């Protein structure tokens, strides 16, 4: 569990570091399917061997099959997960312009059940919030994020999602306030449940919000605090390197990229080097949903 959480945190931090200047990044909910490790291989194989019409027909048959199972066993999680995956696959076949709220709604239904049946797995609730946000139900999305944060105030996925939602509503101060409150309570929360709030991760997220608002001095200060808190953690080093690079301070940025690569586990070194070579991303409007690397297993 710790390794899975850490990998997700690293991926998010790298994404935030690269995209800090456009706010919190967005991948529509169909991207959650497209990045599901357990389904990538099967999907590639299916797409390579079946024409689109045949593939759609096969997926529709799967949906009907899972629905029949759920009529008999409404809380059968294997069927719920299968139904969710099949519907996401059908959704992924559509162009973005073709996706209608009704297409997202059929994904929301199994997600609501899975979130209720697995309150300890915030991934389902985050996906649910993301889906609701995409159909314009911002209040429903906010409620889903708040429900997670009420029991897991340090959940980075929920924090990232809530921050993205607030920024999409032109409420950066509310996003900053949420993160600052999380940090102010981190010591107490971690005393009760050690490790439940990743303080450095929250600081990096806070810095990215400041950076998205072009408050570079504040962002740099937060990153420095994170680096001071844990000098061996490469995440704030990467984030500050991207901040410097965005401001045209390439020489200083290179030093930090090199430091981050030296600190990072082997599996992340190439990603950091690639981030160091990528051209700075210009400012643009913040989109309304969080990135998500994979659906829950």
Language-model segments: residues:
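N-terminal leader/linker segments that initiate helical-solenoid repeat arrays
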Residues: 1-102
């Amino acid at each position: 569990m710790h390794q899975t959480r850490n990998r997700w945190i690293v991926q998010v931090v790298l994404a935030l570091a690269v995209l800090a200047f456009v706010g919190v990044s967005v991948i529509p909910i169909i991207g959650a399917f497209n990045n599901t490790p357990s389904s990538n291989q099967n999907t590639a194989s299916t797409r390579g061997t079946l024409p689109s019409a045949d593939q759609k027909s096969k997926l529709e048959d799967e949906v009907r099959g899972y629905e029949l199972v759920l009529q008999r066993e409404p809380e059968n999680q294997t069927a719920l997960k299968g139904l969710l995956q099949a519907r996401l696959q059908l959704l992924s076949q559509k162009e973005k312009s073709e996706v209608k709220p009704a297409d997202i709604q059929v994904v929301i239904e199994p997600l609501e059940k899975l979130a209720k049946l697995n309150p300890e797995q915030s991934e389902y609730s985050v996906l649910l919030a993301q889906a609701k946000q995409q159909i314009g139900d911002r209040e429903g999305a906010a409620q889903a994020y708040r429900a997670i944060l009420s029991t897991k105030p340090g959940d980075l996925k929920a924090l990232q999602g809530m921050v993205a939602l607030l920024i999409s509503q032109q409420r950066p101060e509310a996003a900053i306030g949420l993160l600052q409150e999380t940090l102010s309570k981190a010591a107490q929360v971690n005393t009760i449940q050690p490790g439940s709030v990743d303080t450095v991760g929250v600081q990096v997220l806070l810095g990215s919000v400041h950076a998205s608002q072009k408050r570079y001095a504040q962002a740099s200060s937060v990153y420095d605090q994170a680096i001071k808190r844990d000098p061996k953690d490469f995440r704030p080093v990467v984030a500050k390197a991207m901040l410097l690079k965005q401001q045209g301070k390439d020489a200083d940025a290179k030093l930090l990229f090199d430091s981050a690569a030296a600190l990072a586990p082997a599996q992340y070194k190439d990603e950091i080097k690639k981030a160091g070579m990528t051209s700075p991303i210009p400012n643009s409007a913040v989109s309304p949903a969080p990135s998500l690397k994979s659906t829950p297993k």
